[in-house]
Each structure stands twice: as C-alpha cells, then as structure tokens.
C-alpha cells in the first residue's frame, strides 16, 4: 500500500519507456496515420512527436529505489482513479469541439498510463483496477483516459481507437451548435 505520490516516484526502466513509445508509433502506422517509408520530413516529425509524447512518463525519478519492473507487481489497485484521468490530451479534432474541456496532461496520470500499459502487457491484459466514485460527467476525453488505464491498447485498436479524437469519433455524438464569442458575435461550431 502506498500513496499516489510514492507510486509515481517509482522509476521505469528506459527499455520500458522506449518500448511504450515504439508501440505508439506502431499503432499510428497500423491505423494508417503515419507512413514510415515515405521519407518525408513531415512524417519524420510526426513520428518523433508520437515517440516523444509516449516516452514522457511525466515524472522525474529522484529516489534510489528499485525499478517498477523489478518489483514484480501482479496487480495495481488505485483508489481515487479519477486522479489519473488526464493522461492524454485531446487532439486537433476533439480540441476544436465547442464545450469540450481540454485540460493539460497530468504528469502523475501519464506515469500511471505507462505503468498500466506495462502491467497489462505483462499480465495478458489484466492487472490494473481503478476505483472511483466520481462520475464521468466532464468529457469523453476523461472517459477515454480512465478507460485507457484498464483496457489494453490491442483492444482499443480492434475498435479503431488509438487517440482521444478516435474515441470521440466512435462514441461521441456531435452537432452544429451556436457559440457566443467574448465580442458578442455568434458563430456555429461542432460541439
């Protein structure tokens, strides 16, 4: 039993972080979002951005404690699971929807996401449980983030989902809405 701060301070091995970022690139290629063979500068930039985002565990490890992988956890049960709901930010599409909050990525949530992915890969899609009494009323991005800690990436890919934008596209229902700007002008937007 440990606090969320103690859990976040447990370091991950560089190999695990690299494997996580390579998996993110592979997922993007599989979904047709990235062409590694094109040789285009834009695709190389996109690949690097995907790798960097996936490799960022969000926390700096300062203590001299064993690596997460060496602790041989077979399960992680996190109370107050809603504390880990900002592990991914909305992409270009979902970020433009009216009334959809797009909070900054939480370092602690990002760390949990990488550790949860490691646990599920090691335990055949199992091993992570999130407990919360906080309802998912904020946004579909919150739902995606929380579900991503307990659903393996392979399962998401079967549904055609690798990003929060995909989740909104598959499960969200949008319509044209009127939004009033600060200037008083009204514009139509997807929301």
Language-model regions, residue ranges each:
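Conserved P-loop NTPase motor "coupling/switch" region that bridges the ATPase
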Residues: 28, 75, 91-191
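Activation segment
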Residues: 10-11, 85, 139
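SF2 helicase catalytic motif II
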Residues: 7, 16-118
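Inter-Walker segment of RecA-like/P-loop motor cores
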Residues: 1-11
């Amino acid at each position: 039993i440990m606090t969320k701060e103690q859990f976040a301070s447990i370091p991950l091995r560089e190999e695990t972080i690299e494997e996580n970022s390579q998996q993110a690139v592979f997922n993007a290629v599989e979904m047709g979002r990235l062409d590694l063979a094109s040789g285009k500068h834009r695709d190389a930039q996109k690949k690097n951005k995907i790798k960097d985002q996936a490799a960022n565990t969000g926390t700096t490890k300062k203590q001299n404690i064993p690596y997460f992988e060496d602790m041989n956890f077979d399960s992680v049960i996190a109370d107050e699971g809603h504390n880990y709901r900002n592990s991914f930010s909305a992409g270009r599409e979902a970020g433009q929807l009216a009334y959809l909050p797009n909070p900054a990525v939480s370092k602690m949530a990002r760390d949990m996401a990488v550790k949860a992915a490691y646990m599920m890969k090691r335990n055949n899609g199992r091993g992570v449980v999130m407990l919360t009494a906080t309802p998912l009323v904020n946004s579909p991005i919150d739902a995606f983030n929380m579900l991503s800690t307990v659903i393996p990436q392979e399962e998401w890919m079967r549904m055609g989902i690798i990003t929060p934008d995909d989740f909104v596209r598959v499960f969200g229902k949008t319509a044209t809405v009127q939004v009033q700007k600060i200037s008083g002008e009204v514009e139509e937007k997807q929301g």
